[in-house]
Amino acid sequence: MPKDKLVITVSGLAGSGTTTLSKKIAEHYGLKHVYAGLIFRQMAKEKGMSLEEFQKYAELHPEIDREVDRRQIEAAKEGNVVIEGRLAGWMVKNADLKIWLDAPIRVRAERVAKREGISVEEAFMKIAEREMQNRKRYLNLYGIDINDLSIYDLIINTSKWSPEGVFAIVKAAIDHLDPVGDAGSKKEKEVG
């Protein structure tokens, strides 16, 4: 069984299932769920911008990303939390378990289209543009290549399992965590 003050990060690209998994983990283990995407969306709404507009705005205003990151790091210090966000694994230095979810872009586009009520083609284009913008922004701001998965403890292609199947895999990993494991040591570079 995992240690007290458990900290888990769940990262992945749009439509990979990070929110679904994070909610399941939080509910099952009684953890708080901190969602970087929601923080980002709330900030966009506060500025009266669409997500796409705010994405472009954030490229020119690094304080946006830094505020999202600061909130994630603060939540991790409190413990008993699942932190969901593309950079959560990079930002939370000593997470007990760092998870990356992936799926082919077509599968992710289908999921996003269903969730947002748009065509698969439109979702595909939005995802591709957003990922290009994010990758550039993370490289410029932190020197992080979002495609570098070397810091993650568990990488899952969510197109191969149902959400329940993905959770079962992650639950097994959490339930068998070594309480004196590496806690992310040596695997990651310093950020910010």
From Swiss-Prot:
Membrane-spanning ranges: none
- A Gene Ontology CC term for this entry? cytoplasm
Q: What is its EC number?
A: 2.7.4.25
Q: What protein name does the entry list?
A: Cytidylate kinase
Q: Does ATP-binding show up as a keyword for this record? A: yes
Q: Which domain of life is it from?
A: Archaea
For this protein, the record's SUPFAM superfamilies field holds: P-loop containing nucleoside triphosphate hydrolases
Stored HAMAP family: Cytidyl_kinase_type2
What family name appears in the similarity comment? Belongs to the cytidylate kinase family. Type 2 subfamily.
Could you mention a single GO BP entry for this protein?
A: pyrimidine nucleotide metabolic process
Gene3D superfamilies of this UniProt entry? P-loop containing nucleotide triphosphate hydrolases (3.40.50.300)
Subcellular location, record wording: Cytoplasm
What this protein catalyses is: CMP + ATP = CDP + ADP; dCMP + ATP = dCDP + ADP
Which Pfam families does the entry link to?
Cytidylate_kin2
Q: Which GO terms describe its molecular function?
A: ATP binding; CMP kinase activity; dCMP kinase activity
Gene giving rise to this polypeptide: cmk
Instruction: Give the keywords, sorted.
Output: ATP-binding, Cytoplasm, Kinase, Nucleotide-binding, Transferase
Q: Where on this chain does ATP bind? A: 12-20
The answer to whether UniProt assigns keyword Cytoplasm to this entry is yes
